[in-house]
Amino acid sequence: MFAQVIQGRTKDPAAMWNRSEDWDRTLKPGAEGFLGSTAGVSDDGEVVVVARFESEEAARKNSDRPEQGAWWAETEKLFEGDVAFYDSSDVEISWGGGSDEAGFVQIMQGRAQNEEMRARWKEAEAEAEEWMRENRPDVMGALAIWQGTNFTNVMYFTSEEEARKGEQQQPPEESGESGQDDWMEQVEDLKFIDIKKPYFSSP
């Protein structure tokens, strides 16, 4: 799998939503290798789009289409300031990788201090999986996109209300979930982006 992350700011979330719908109608049918996307705007205007493709080649072919270039030229006008692009084939899927039925998406971004710290995260996540499945029915899946030790983690929830309730639970140490909490305390430049009205696109 290959993932593209597009990130910036806008003052017009409704127009951004319309551009996503336009892409679905006019460009998705010709996007070979497209696996799906998650997009949205936070309450303070931060835009995040996560698009998934079968391969880097498929993503490049999509980007090189003239109609894709024309669509982006119009969409780019809705952003304020610079737009950041992150591409990666280093993608990890957890708990099924998410769902288009999610009512709330939370994006966590940051930087692990080193590769060893990244490995510890993977171990803690594996240890926590059983507890999460049994005690956090609000979690519908997750996707982690890595660029070296920089990461974008996309978590899918049934709803924001259920996600907040789930956050209040105190898992036992042996579950592995507490290890994830300890890990996050060491992450550099940690930030959370809440997408309360996610837009999903599927092939």
Predicted segments with their positions:
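Short S/T/G/P-rich N-terminal loop/turn motif that feeds into the first structured element of a domain
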Residues: 1-48, 52-203
